[in-house]
């Protein structure tokens, strides 16, 4: 893509961010990363072998000269746990960036807004670039930005559900009201058309994992997601035609017999 995604002063050529979980093998994960064109992938700190680096690890299958690793705090249910996990990721050399997750409900995996805000404030003070996974509440997003978040990542639907964009109105509001930091749709994308819709609504980027990893042909789906994000971005930049209630002829009447 010609335009770049900029977060915390760093530029990324791709507006697609992909994950590292649920793949059938590390080799498949690696092929999907290549097919997606993503230059940022998110890694759960809890999944990285931090004690014995001689054993095979998913990190071994990520080309860090081409791909930026975004650690995440998946599985954390309190602000304290999320902060400790982020700190651990930095200490072992992953990154001083973090996709911050503080989960508030085990069944829906919806975020705990209060805990998320608390952890954001702490980690920003500790020098992290914080990208919080949040709901599609503009008020809460504003609070996260005021706390120093480098981006906001509203969900499109529950994590891993594949339901697609469930509240396009709120995402459109995000686009209109948030200009200070990127808006990255996170969670709920199921197929390439969902990614395209998110981008058409004005999202700066899309993050996904299960939609690719759980596809019957994961590599092919990774390629589809790449094209979906690019397609949606181009459509957003193009400015779609206005919707009309009635028909409007696309061909001129000049030269029509009897006109």
Curated annotation (Swiss-Prot):
InterPro entries: Aldolase_TIM, Thiazole_synthase_ThiG, ThiG
Gene Ontology biological-process entries: thiamine diphosphate biosynthetic process
Major location (coarse): cytoplasm
This protein's GO CC annotations: cytoplasm
Binding site for 1-deoxy-D-xylulose 5-phosphate: 160, 187-188, 209-210
Localization per record: Cytoplasm
Family as reported in the entry's similarity comment: Belongs to the ThiG family.
Record text on subunit structure and interactions: Homotetramer. Forms heterodimers with either ThiH or ThiS.
Protein name as it appears in the record: Thiazole synthase
